[in-house]
């Protein structure tokens, strides 16, 4: 299935007419394709399956809680760079042993919280 497609000169996203979507939402808004997200996850996991890696999604790329929950359902981890992102990953249900705390300039509070939650690693 194509994500974007014209049918009878009308743009469709996931086979839904864009005009219909626009009638249901105020603009501007973000529109995500859950089908495409799942397809991307499957492709990435398939590409690396022989190595059995922990694939961590960088929460700074998109912190939408619904998307993060979908990542959790697909057994992905999280790469976080702040206390807020760490709390969001945990709120999404991502297991602490699948959370990597990257970035520089971590506060004592952030480090203590990460240790208390027993996350996988804290990178300096």
What is each stretch, according to the model?
Residues 1-121:
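A charged N-terminal "starter" segment
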